[in-house]
């Protein structure tokens, strides 16, 4: 299932940033079609069939579906798609939060595979992904997992395989905490005419994060595991405020020692 293997009929749902990425990635090795209700988003996709209606999927008869729409609509789109695909078609998603996905997949009767490319066009160099990561859910269809394992390995991604439950817990650390920290930085921001290096680096990250689609940001923040992490941030800020109020040098030294250990590789 990949370069040097047999050709598959693959349907990409959604022609946004990641949907377009997968079209570019797969369209020269497989027979690919992209479905999006907005024809404007299909304009610049090449070497692929372009669908704007679910009825067009029937004749294509995909063997694999990659759902790249936003999390808010992922399962809704699957529901609408199911009458238009065969029972042997493998369902897959690349969602950043997967709460309830395992239960959904199992009630469809379809084979399934789930993964999460831990990068996006905002920050990643799509020409060199060797420093980027991807998660492959260890549950689901064996052959589907082989397809995505081979695909991500070919891209040079660092791949980790974990369960659905472990995925959302992991995301609450790797995405929710940085995103919330960025929100706090941006919320208290004032324009600086002579910013220092650290400030400029934070500003670059903040602009990148906040350039993401609102739906994606909501997906990350509404992860059921996010709230406890935000409460941890609040508790740390409360402790730091107390140290500052007390001007307690020993407490500050202990605090810095502790947090430096947290970021050691």
Model regions and ranges:
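NAD(P)+-binding Rossmann beta1-loop-alpha1 motif at the extreme N-terminus of oxidoreductases
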Residues: 6-51, 56
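Short loop/helix-cap segments at secondary-structure boundaries that form the rim of catalytic
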Residues: 40-47, 59-60, 102-108
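ADP-ribose/adenylate-binding Rossmann-like module
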Residues: 85-101
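Rossmann-fold dinucleotide-binding core
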Residues: 97, 101, 105-158
């Amino acid at each position: 299932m990949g370069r040097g293997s047999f050709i598959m009929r693959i349907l990409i749902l959604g022609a946004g940033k990641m949907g377009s990425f997968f079209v570019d990635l797969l369209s020269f090795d497989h027979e690919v079609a992209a479905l999006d209700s907005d024809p404007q988003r299909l304009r610049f996709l090449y070497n692929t069939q372009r669908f704007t209606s679910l009825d067009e999927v029937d004749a294509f008869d995909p063997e694999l579906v990659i759902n790249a729409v936003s999390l808010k609509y992922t399962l809704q789109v699957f529901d609408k798609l199911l009458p238009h695909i065969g029972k042997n078609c493998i369902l897959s998603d690349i969602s950043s939060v997967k709460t309830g996905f395992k239960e959904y997949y199992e009630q469809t009767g379809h084979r399934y595979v789930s993964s999460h490319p831990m990068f996006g066009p905002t920050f990643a160099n799509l020409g060199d992904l060797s420093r980027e990561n991807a998660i492959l859910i260890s549950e689901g269809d064996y052959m589907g997992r082989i397809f995505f394992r081979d695909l991500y390995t070919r891209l040079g991604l660092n791949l980790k395989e974990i369960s659905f439950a472990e995925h959302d817990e992991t995301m609450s650390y790797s995405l929710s905490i940085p995103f919330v920290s960025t929100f706090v930085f941006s919320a208290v921001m004032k324009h600086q005419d002579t910013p220092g290096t650290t400030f400029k680096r934070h500003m670059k990250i903040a602009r990148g994060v906040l350039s993401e689609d609102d739906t994606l940001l909501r997906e990350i923040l509404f992860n059921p595991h996010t709230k406890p992490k935000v409460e941890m941030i609040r508790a740390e800020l409360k402790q730091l405020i107390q140290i500052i109020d007390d001007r307690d040098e020993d407490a500050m030294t202990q605090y810095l020692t502790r947090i430096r250990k947290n970021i050691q590789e």
